[in-house]
UniProtKB/Swiss-Prot annotation:
The lineage of its organism: Bacteria, Bacillati, Actinomycetota, Actinomycetes, Micrococcales. It comes from the Bacteria. Lysis of cellular walls containing beta-1,3-glucans. Implicated in the defense against fungal pathogens. Residues 422-548 form the Ricin B-type lectin domain. Predicted to be exported by the Tat system. The position of the signal peptide cleavage has not been experimentally proven. The gene is glcI. This is Glucan endo-1,3-beta-glucosidase. GO terms for biological process: cell wall organization.
Length: 548
């Protein structure tokens, strides 16, 4: 947690900065009691890709020691006694599921990756007394260059399981990840829209970024490199992002950027202004606390080098936020960062097209398309502090995927039905409820999350007609919209489809049948007081789990 600071003289200064959302945690969390999480949990891998054979690898670090885990979850350190010349690593592969099949292994407490390859085993090497040489397929000489593979990142420790689907290094074979909670429900992420895998490549090539695409000797697509790698090997031009960065630097010579990196500390803010080639940030006392040289394209796409983010509570959070604003090309349009509204992301013609398309093709809009995509909680990550099981589902390359559901099956849990009649709070998370701001029944007042209080603004009557009412008004999808991100507000009851809702007791989703989408906390986890509510593609995440 950031160090406490005396805020009495800083509050007036901080009020000049608009309130914005914060960075979320990535793959590190606050530890719960050690007894909460066992030494291993089951990991079920389901192969819906139609391809095989599949080879699995569980690789990572424990207590600073690198190694691999077998199917039973036993950790094996890599051999020592290795010098600076890489040597082949022991075969750590685990036989994966055949097409249409599943296998379950044990996932141990590690911080690392689960790799999976299609058709042939991968090649790993070790160096310098047991350090793993990870695949680096941006180099044509890498032994894994012509192998189709992908991986998920995970951390399992006493604080729970963090697992994500990642595109930080490349876009390749589609997959989902999930975690089962103690109540039996499964949170999942990573599912693509129908035909989203090929749609990504088509759009990337049409935008002139086809140099990132790597093909197998037979001409089939293997992956698209993340521009953080592509820029370093000359696969894309730096001209566009260089132009954008120059304009940003010039813009902030005469105005300030306000960075509010922590939602739980809205008073912790930093103001930055450009001086020469340096973007200099000050705290509330006017003291300079961080400075960043005008970054080159590699620094922006990789969020490193000139934008290096140390693991501290000042420079690192500022660097993360600044890099996210540059990658998403929101720095010019919004001086208050991080930007809370994803609708404004990637709108500049000079934007990171790779990241834009990765988010566009995700069913829930969330991706890990660059290193700090968790700024503002836009990353494809699920977490639970008491995980019962984990899931990876290898999805089809064409057509429509099905979401991970209870037990890791491909069937949706529960059957969406009617709306149970009754009156009471609509709870989400442990302490929050659906709320009419200021108990104001004016039409178009967008609903929000607020700490549960039991007042009239949080008492919702669920009718047999499918309506949800509070303060004499109906819960309504703004202007009968169907797009992700459409606001949900209260409005005079009118009997239209914009005011009809169903409830799935298994997934705890409140669904608007007219749009086919679910009631969603804007921006996802971490859930927080004041968070607006919207319509979004149903995804079984924490942001859509409502308790009647």
């Amino acid at each position: 947690m950031p160090h406490d600071r005396k805020n009495s003289s800083r509050r007036a200064w901080a009020a000049l900065c608009a309130a914005v959302l914060a960075v979320s945690g990535a793959l590190v969390g606050v530890a719960a009691p050690a007894s909460a999480v066992p030494a291993t949990i089951p990991l079920t891998i389901t192969n819906d890709s139609g391809r095989g054979p599949i080879y699995l690898y569980v690789l990572g670090e424990r207590d600073g020691v690198a190694g691999w885990a077998d199917a039973g979850g036993t950790f094996h350190p890599w051999p020592g006694g290795v010098g600076p010349v890489p040597v082949p690593a022991p075969d750590a592969s685990i036989a994966g599921p055949g097409p249409g099949q599943s296998v379950t292994i044990r996932l141990p407490k590690l911080s690392g990756r689960v790799y999976y390859s299609y058709g042939q085993k991968m090649t790993f090497q070790i160096v310098l007394d047991g350090r793993l040489v990870q695949p680096a397929v941006q180099n044509d000489s890498d032994p894994n260059r012509n192998i189709l593979f992908n991986w998920t990142e995970y951390t399992l420790n006493d604080g729970g399981l963090w697992i994500n689907s990642t595109q930080v290094d490349h876009w390749s074979a589609p997959y989902q990840v999930g975690v089962q909670r103690a109540d039996g429900q499964v949170l999942s992420t990573g599912m693509l829209k129908p035909n989203g895998y090929e749609a990504f490549y088509t759009a990337l090539e049409s935008a002139g970024w086809g140099g990132l695409v790597q093909r197998a000797p037979d001409g089939s697509r293997l992956r698209a490199l993340n521009p953080s790698h592509g820029i370093d090997v000359g696969k894309i031009s730096s001209a566009s992002i260089d132009s954008y960065v120059t304009e940003v630097w010039n813009s902030y010579r005469t105005r300030d950027m306000c960075v509010t990196p922590f939602s739980h500390e809205p008073g912790t803010q930093f103001r930055g202004r450009v001086d020469g080639d340096w973007f200099r940030f000050r705290n509330g006392s006017g003291q300079e606390v961080a400075a960043f040289k005008k970054p080159d394209a590699s620094s922006v796409y990789g969020c490193h080098k000139d934008l290096q983010a140390p693991n501290d509570h000042v420079v690192g959070p500022i660097a993360r936020t600044l890099c996210a604003a540059l990658v998403r090309t929101t720095a010019l349009t919004n001086p208050n960062q991080p930007d809370a509204n994803s609708a404004g992301f990637y709108q500049d013609a000079r934007t990171n097209v790779y990241a834009k398309l990765a988010h566009q093709q995700m069913a829930n809009g969330k991706a890990y398309a660059f290193a700090f995509d968790d700024v503002g909680a836009h990353e494809s990550l699920v977490h639970d502090g008491n995980p019962q099981a984990a899931y990876i589902k290898l999805d089809p390359f064409t057509g429509t995927a099905t979401p991970i559901a209870n037990g890791g099956s491909t069937e949706q849990p529960g059957t969406p039905g009617g709306l149970p009649a009754g009156t009471g709070a609509l709870r989400i998370g442990s302490t929050l409820c659906l709320d009419v701001p200021w108990a104001d029944p004016t039409d178009t007042n967008q609903v929000q999350l607020a700490t549960c209080s039991g007042n009239a603004a949080q008492q919702w009557t669920r009718g047999t007609d499918g309506t949800v009412r509070a303060l004499g008004k109906c819960l309504d999808v703004a202007r009968s919209g169907t797009a992700d991100g459409t606001a949900v507000w209260i409005y005079t009851c009118n009997g239209t489809g914009a005011q009809k809702w169903t409830y799935d007791s298994a997934t705890k989703a409140l669904r608007n049948p007219q749009s086919g989408k679910c009631l969603d906390a804007q921006g996802g986890a971490p859930l927080r007081d004041g968070q607006k509510v919207q319509l979004w593609t149903c995804n079984q995440t924490e942001a859509q789990r409502w308790t009647l």
